[in-house]
Regions:
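Carboxylate-rich, polar loop motifs that coordinate divalent cations or form catalytic acidic clusters
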Residues: 1-251
């Protein structure tokens, strides 16, 4: 069975509490399909999932970037054979971006559909290349953002810019064209090439952040490691109650 790691478990829990349950229960018999790990490359850890064009699904897996076309599973390793931590299926670039450990790049199809890997991190300087775990890859306005353990790399028109953060970055998300990062010092946003604390979220400055999710009414839902969920609209931050706070803290 595909094993979703702790970072991803927060997203699964939130998904379950925000979707309309009636629809789920109505189609429960076909909602979950189980695939044994022997089918998809025996990598027991899967970190992210990215669908593409209603035909393929891509997985950031311990053994590499995994592709599933509805019938066949194919594993594509990175150059350094590290775990793949993140995956982004870009319909604008027609590429599958993947991030591992101190490496990121993209897979692009040849005329016959075969995916070929192109390493991008090899173009960085030695110091900038020490990204650690690449937990997030995002794109907005033709800019690619690659989130490592303590820095973000921006890529535009063949040029790279590295923005370091004086904190451990645990997660990131692109919301309405703005890159949010969750750290062990609260939530920050990237403006140009500078990180700024998220306005209205000062109360979370000492919290470790595990997830940042757009809210349908504007603002973001912030997932903390130990204190549950919060809603921030850029002015104030309040607890976001689901009724499952105790369960999330224990799990």
């Amino acid at each position: 069975m595909i094993r979703i790691q702790p970072y991803s478990s927060y997203w699964v829990l939130i998904f379950l509490f925000l979707i309309p349950f009636g629809k789920v229960f109505a189609g429960w018999n076909s909602f979950i399909v189980n695939f044994d790990k022997s089918l998809y490359g025996k990598g027991t850890q899967t970190w992210q999932i990215a669908p593409y064009d209603d035909h393929w699904v891509y997985f950031a897996n311990k053994n590499g970037m995994v592709q599933f076309d509805g019938n066949v599973w194919t594993v594509f390793p990175m150059n350094n054979f590290s775990d793949v931590r993140s995956v982004l299926a870009s319909t604008t670039q027609k590429r599958i971006y993947a991030g591992g450990i101190n490496e990121f790049g993209y897979y692009e199809p040849l005329d016959d559909g075969e995916l070929v890997y192109h390493c991008m991190s090899d173009s960085l300087g030695d110091a900038s290349r020490l990204l650690g775990n690449v937990w997030g890859i995002h794109e907005a306005d033709n800019i690619l953002y690659v989130q490592g353990d303590d820095r973000v790399v921006k890529y535009l028109n063949g040029k790279y810019a590295t923005i370091e953060m004086d904190a451990k970055i645990d997660c990131s998300n692109m919301v309405n064209g703005i890159l949010y990062i969750g750290t062990d010092r609260g939530v920050w946003v990237l403006v140009g090439n500078t990180f700024f604390p998220l306005q209205g979220a000062d109360s979370l400055a000492s919290n470790r952040i595990r997830g940042i999710i757009p809210h349908k009414g504007g603002g973001v839902i912030i997932v903390t490691a130990y204190d549950g969920l919060f809603y921030c609209n850029g002015r104030t931050t309040v607890p976001f109650t689901t009724g499952a706070e105790d369960f999330m803290r224990e799990n």
